[in-house]
């Protein structure tokens, strides 16, 4: 099994609901370690840069507006097959289609307000982690 790192974001809707601890607890119970974390309010520029691959799509402006609407918690998770495990814990993008017991089924309101984000591949994880964190901010444990 491969030890991987993945980026996770607790989105503004979940922060507003005060469920950060519940989200983190699920990661830790599943065996993932948090090796970096910070709470921040994304600027429009930072959100646009992070979601640049979606620029030009109909949902882009709404996504940027939502992600800048309140604070987020950005973290790096580490563990065996962390990318796939995090995606399994999150559940389907649409909470109505998410499996019981997943973060999105339990905490998300809609496709647009779906509580959490996670990297979808090793290449994305590396790029996204580097977008938010300097190497000195990551604390292997």
Swiss-Prot record:
EC annotation from Swiss-Prot or TrEMBL: 2.7.4.6
Family: Belongs to the NDK family.
Native organism: Saccharophagus degradans (strain 2-40 / ATCC 43961 / DSM 17024)
Pfam families assigned: NDK
Keyword vocabulary terms for this entry: ATP-binding, Cytoplasm, Kinase, Magnesium, Metal-binding, Nucleotide metabolism, Nucleotide-binding, Phosphoprotein, Transferase
Lineage per the UniProt record: Bacteria, Pseudomonadati, Pseudomonadota, Gammaproteobacteria, Cellvibrionales
CDD domains: NDPk_I (cd04413)
InterPro entries tied to this protein: NDK-like_dom, NDK-like_dom_sf, Nucleoside_diP_kinase
Record's protein name: Nucleoside diphosphate kinase
Main subcellular localisation: cytoplasm
Gene: ndk
Entries under PANTHER family matching the protein: NUCLEOSIDE DIPHOSPHATE KINASE (PTHR11349)
Any one Gene Ontology BP term: UTP biosynthetic process
